[in-house]
């Protein structure tokens, strides 16, 4: 800018010259010379850091404004800096008065609350703008109108933290604070348990320079995985080192830091640990203009002398520096809007306020600017920042090069912006719908996972080999194949370890877990790949992937032996009750037929049809004939008894219809009962087990099957659990192998998963599954609760399912040699063992008829005994003479001695065996004699009857 010059020669000083000089000084010089605006800064210093970062940012901003004349073309910004010790409020007040005496337009700093309150009271009394860039304890007195604070409001940050906790669905949170102000900053979160289902545990860090490892050890023991740290970035850097030392820098922990300088820390050691680390960022590095300023700052800092170790990246601009930079720019913008801004010297002891103070304060509060920390606007009432954004950032392993500067590239590489929190609209997570397919293996690639499992055929078995095997090569089976497929998809490595106690995982009465579930809870394992059932109680303490196999509980029992066919198995088609009812029906029908036949007149007939006037009538349906009619119909044989009356024919027809159905049903069932060897089992379902106590039953101790019966509310299963719990030493087994051996050797039924039963029955034909499935469940891959691997494992399992590999693996390990068919498709031929009883019945009938004939013989002999009581032998001969004859005749007898004696019978038999000629001659001679004898016997019997009559 060119400047006007006036030359005044000596001796020419006149009155006009004086007026010209006065005009130049009053009008020309102010328009042509730049205006100077002075601002003051009060900054604390420490012993090892003579110049703090806020002072450097203050100078950097003033220099940038003076170099870029577009903002203040006619004004030069100057500053006065005063340094004080920490927490020295008296020195801060004295230095503030010194700067006000110099005529500063605004005061910046200090940072700590005790000093800032003293300076703020002076500025408020003299009506000078006070600019703050640090968190300040909220003041109860609202009369402090002459200050603004660019640091986000504590209540807003507290709401942002609470929104994130709710978004992540954390049910248990640990808050670790550095000093008492942390409880004020997080009061919205601390009040959360009263409104939300969140448990909050509050802990305090030890004083400065104290070891925090005991606190971290206690947190690790208590399994506190979600931790919020409220501390400075220096403390955060030290805490992270101790967390790494304690082995708590794993993927199961999620740390959130409230400091806005988390992004500026050197976290290279923790990037590949898998830990979840989240924080806020106020710098708007997405803006190219902001990135360029950060690069300039970084270049200047790298050229400066090295600073003490603070854990920050070299040359990184902190949030404090960015806020101070923006604060200086806000004052510059306000001064640019003021046409004339003349600041006079102020004296603290006079209490005379600045004349331009209120106007300048309003200009600052009304200013709008997109600075390094985003859009800046103020609330005119309290001077606090409003409508601001907080970037939500998360630590990651690899990133994309999106920025041009080295510092910005590093920020994009280490941190990922996953959302934005706005003071008005709240939380907006922009990373919720990210493309998983492109980045699915980021956290698993080349990572070695500890896998816990249990020996269980065919899921995990020792590999058979002549050479010693080590590591994962020791094992084979379904779960090892599944692990291999998951590893191929996700790219991780794994180390398989057997669970020490050999149990799946159950909870005792004290709430303590064992088995593989405990391994996951204690984070001694990353995955549990085994036949681990997904249950409600386990889901509360660990996470599960989607099931890779579905199944249910069933009963393993010995195959029943085939029933040996009995000789009377032909009776099996009808139950004993039916046989009895059939016999009773036969007797009943016979009696009814006898009564009706006697009652109806149409069943009586004349035995002498040639003599129609005869008064003698007869009835064929005697009691014995009626019974014989019923038996003949039942046996499907004729009895030569014909009912004549309609009533008796109705009885006969109904009886025939009854016998038709009975015989048809018997015939239909006879084939099945005689040709098929029946397999009878004492139990057919869980209900059968529950109803008896002879067969002992149980499950694997501390397994999901045992837990199912223990927790079940169904009466049948409650009864079964009562049985098992009363006999725990004998009913519950240690593992499946022990249970299978008991099933084979004793009268024991094992309750286990259907897939395991399927495998066992394929290899042992003496075992079988009884009944259907008691429940329905699935096997899943277990992970510690909150594990980042669960979703990736689930996606990989679904991929294997769609490709059919899960089915192929099951076919590979379940397929056995197979067992022979239990039942032949063709009916077997009947043997003596099937129908031998029929021959026994026939023989018994023949023997019975012989004895009945003898009985009839004896009975008739007694009845027809002569009056003159002959001997036993003569009575026998008499009976034979009267009963055994060829045909009736009334001719005379040849004598008693010749009546069909034993010799006559033998003679007749001998004649029949001779030749034809001799047979005819002799038969005529002997036959005539015998025939005459028979007639004589008959005649004598007739005469005796008449005599007796």
UniProtKB/Swiss-Prot annotation:
Homotetramer or heterotetramer of pore-forming glutamate receptor subunits. Tetramers may be formed by the dimerization of dimers. Can form functional heteromeric receptors with GRIK4 and GRIK5. Interacts with KLHL17. It catalyses: Ca(2+)(in) = Ca(2+)(out). Changing residue 636 to R: In RNA edited version. The postsynaptic actions of Glu are mediated by a variety of receptors that are named according to their selective agonists. This receptor binds domoate > kainate > L-glutamate = quisqualate > CNQX = DNQX > AMPA > dihydrokainate > NMDA. This is Glutamate receptor ionotropic, kainate 1. Disulfide bonds join 765-819. Ionotropic glutamate receptor that functions as a cation-permeable ligand-gated ion channel, gated by L-glutamate and the glutamatergic agonist kainic acid. L-glutamate acts as an excitatory neurotransmitter at many synapses in the central nervous system. Binding of the excitatory neurotransmitter L-glutamate induces a conformation change, leading to the opening of the cation channel, and thereby converts the chemical signal to an electrical impulse. The receptor then desensitizes rapidly and enters a transient inactive state, characterized by the presence of bound agonist. The gene is Grik1. It comes from Rattus norvegicus (Rat).
